[in-house]
Amino acid sequence: MSHATHLLGFPRIGAKRELKTLLERYWKQELDEAALSQGAKELRQKHWLLQKGAGVELSPVGDFSLYDHVLDAQLLVGAAPARFGFDAAALTTGQYFELARGNAVQPAMEMTKWFDTNYHYLVPEWHADTAFSAQPERLLSQLREARALGVAAKPVLLGPLSLLWLGKAKGRPFDRLALLPGLVAAYRELLSSLRAAGAEWAQIDEPILALDLEPSWLDAFAPAYAQLSRHAPKLLLATYFGDVSEHAARLKSLPVAGLHLDLVRAPEQISAFLPDYPADKVLSAGIVDGRNIWRADLSALLDRLAPLAQQLGDRLWLAPSCSLLHSPFDAAAETGLDPELKNWLAFAVQKLNELKTLKRGLEHGRSAIAGELSGSDFAREQRRASPRIHDPAVARRLAALPEGTDRRASPYPIRAERQQAWLKLPPLPTTTIGSFPQTPAIRASRAAFKKGELSAAGYRQAMEKEIELAIRRQEALGLDVLVHGEAERNDMVEYFGEQLAGFAFTAGGWVQSYGSRCVKPPIIFGDVARPKPMTVDWARYAQSLTAKPVKGMLTGPVTILQWSFVRDDLPRREVCRQIALALNDEVLDLEAAGIRVIQIDEPAIREGLPLKRAGRDVYLAWAGEAFRLSSRGVDDATQIHTHMCYSEFGDILPAIAALDADVITIETSRSDMALLADFGRFRYPNAIGPGVYDIHSPRVPSAAEIRALLDKALRVIPAERLWVNPDCGLKTRGWPEVEAALAAMVAVGRELREKLAQAA
């Protein structure tokens, strides 16, 4: 009996973020297109050979992308956004990046979260007359590359229903499903080309099956796949990120050769599929966690797999739960990590070995993997018994919290009056979201400090110089509420995690967020507490430089949770409450230091939502409680801000309002202020700062564009509750474009302020 091992996808960025380096050198015109193409090819080949060497029997092809796999899927079917005027059949590399990053004429495509992960995809744009045509050459070229290396390759495609669903209808209203026949025809041609090129299998991902879908979308699967299965390779329909058991009968009846199930997120769903599982289908068990970094309990997994192997025989395949895109590359490279903690970890490379071990155990018995099982069992018991995991003081503090302790003393209208009396802000106050450009000088100082080449005093002096520069530039621009610029911060989560008990950090545990943007999530391995203040000295120094209010800047508890690799031995709610209390200590210390505007960023609050409606109320209740716990006890005159991005809020606005932040800033420019309709219908009660320009693009907005967005905002939000700000932090931009964009933003804000005064 043999069980094939395969991957749904592999980290694109490389062991040392080679893709990031390639992209950024190309964008700076240090590499030409040929060098970029060759570098990407070499990276793909290195990854395929690594997988082959680790025993992976079917490697994914087409999961690699220069920017985003959803954008690539659009281009495979010839559907570049119409507003750019590009011919998808003759798209240049430069035009590809213009879609993702914008150009002088068109803003970049909208970007949003990939389901409940911290990866961002570019949102497809559909029009009623969108036409599709198969453009298979990129995929065929990569298939040829893999086969030339002797790699057994499995092309990977984002499925047509998911691609269509993930996009937005543009122009006149229409039903996106009206585009499905043309889209399916293009997919048929793609699949036919793959079959003709010798592909035995093709993986088609339909992650939307883990969502609450309307009947019309569900009903579209059977006829679509009836068409797709003709003249195609064997199709493996992949689902992930959640439970699809309610669709078991439908999925088992589809004319595909196999199904992939996420048995990490939803292990119980297997019971809905095993009865009467079709004899002509393989079942791919997503048994190794593709999204977290903890070492697998191999003994327990073998116990779960044994009955599946007995029933299915060779038709049982082994795989990670989802693409390893969401996993860091290689834990073996973490030479500076505590050895005990390192022994608990498995990154992408280690997960390949776990698959190989499980395969050997199923095929040859546990005695064949006795050493691996012993190591796995030891790591599990070592972690369970480790005294570093539990802090009794944290547990006592949580248990002692009185009921209702997360509520502000007074309602928003009273707080707003007291805050205005203290802050004396003009109408339409201008501010930024927090970070300013991380210049080469800043990065060099931080690197030198971490290497011991720069003393603590020297580092503080360098950072204070950058803070003063940021304050002076903001004063010159005329902003009303200033920020210190976060020069001292490497990452909005890592910075805090480095100073909190219960966190650990890797040197190379990077994962892709979007394009060349990578993040290095901290590891929450134990109880969380704040040993000492984290931001107070920097904020106090910044405030000493100016008479204008300076915001204290914190990352919120839900975002720290969502953007970390979280311990799996405690409910996420409890971990989040621990983080909230640690942050509350910081908030109260900031207030005591004279900081009267404190921003608690929660850009990730929506991505924590369960993908299905069941369970969302429970999540939103504890997420809201955690946010309020983090700001509990502050004076009415202290203004609490929060920031959220890449989100659709319509269905969770009551929960957002329940956070009771005095000011919420949101990312809206890429969606042309579409989010504001939701806020208007809901009559959001507190102040709002909708982003007036897109910081993810190097393009500097015109005053006319900013004015148009603010005019839209003023139709929905009363002027006395409207703030003027960019979409997000400015860390990744350069100072010339930042100053130009902010100057335009401040000028438009003042212009509208004068109009309001005249109208009054």
From Swiss-Prot:
Q: Which UniProt keywords apply?
A: Amino-acid biosynthesis, Metal-binding, Methionine biosynthesis, Methyltransferase, Repeat, Transferase, Zinc
CDD domains, A to Z? CIMS_C_terminal_like, CIMS_N_terminal_like
Give me the residues that bind Zn(2+), please.
Answer: H643, C645, E667, C728
This protein's source sits in the domain of life called Bacteria
**Any idea which residues are catalytic in this one?**
H696 (proton donor)
Documented EC number(s):
2.1.1.14
User: One Pfam family name from the record?
Assistant: Meth_synt_1
Pathway per its UniProt entry is:
Amino-acid biosynthesis; L-methionine biosynthesis via de novo pathway; L-methionine from L-homocysteine (MetE route): step 1/1
Which residues hold 5-methyltetrahydropteroyltri-L-glutamate?
Answer: R17, E18, L19, K20, K113, R517, C518, W563, E607
* GO molecular function term, any single one: zinc ion binding
- Keyword Repeat assigned: yes
Report the catalytic activity: 5-methyltetrahydropteroyltri-L-glutamate + L-homocysteine = tetrahydropteroyltri-L-glutamate + L-methionine
Which residues make up the binding site for L-homocysteine?
I433, G434, S435, E486, D601
Q: How is the cofactor bound?
A: Binds 1 zinc ion per subunit.
The Swiss-Prot or TrEMBL record lists the needed cofactor(s) as: Zn(2+)
Q: Which GO terms describe its biological process?
A: methionine biosynthetic process; methylation
The residues that hold L-methionine are I433, G434, S435, E486, D601
| Protein family | Belongs to the vitamin-B12 independent methionine synthase family.
According to its UniProt entry, the function of this protein is described as:
Catalyzes the transfer of a methyl group from 5-methyltetrahydrofolate to homocysteine resulting in methionine formation.
Q: This chain belongs to which protein, by name? A: 5-methyltetrahydropteroyltriglutamate--homocysteine methyltransferase
The root-end lineage is: Bacteria, Pseudomonadati, Pseudomonadota, Betaproteobacteria, Neisseriales
Q: Quote the gene name from the UniProt entry.
A: metE
